[in-house]
Amino acid sequence: MRLWATMMMAVSIGIVAGAQKDGSGGVHVDPAKVAAALAKGGPLVTRSDLLVQGSHREAAGQVEVHDKETDVLYVVDGEATFVFGGKMVGGKVSRPEQWLGTDITGGETHHIGKGDVFVIPAGVPHWFKEVPKSVSYFVVKVLKQ
């Protein structure tokens, strides 16, 4: 299962970031830009139907719920405790169609590391609850129109 998910993520990134600019709508992202995004966090591809970004965390985050974004996460380095599902505690709107909260009750807790892939559908609470040192990962946000 993990191999299949990793392969699907690689195919998704290849379609978005590996194609040459030839009028087909494909986009190539230079390896230096990818490395910079994974080191500090930052966007790689921005389109009306999806976003691809590199992310880097050195501390826990807040609980997030996106009304119209499915997140696909692929961990490339580090480790963390990641929780998803259940119900958000203390949710407040942070921007249109996104909520931030303080905790999750009844969610699934996973110790994650290099090679892990998660698909978080729109409407599902999720967060990096603990980050002992750091974690770097790609996020593909598939946007509902």
How would you name each of these model-derived features?
Residues 54, 82-84, 137:
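Short hydrophobic/aromatic-rich beta-strand segments that constitute the beta-sheet cores
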Residues 133-145:
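A short hydrophobic beta-strand segment most commonly corresponding to one strand
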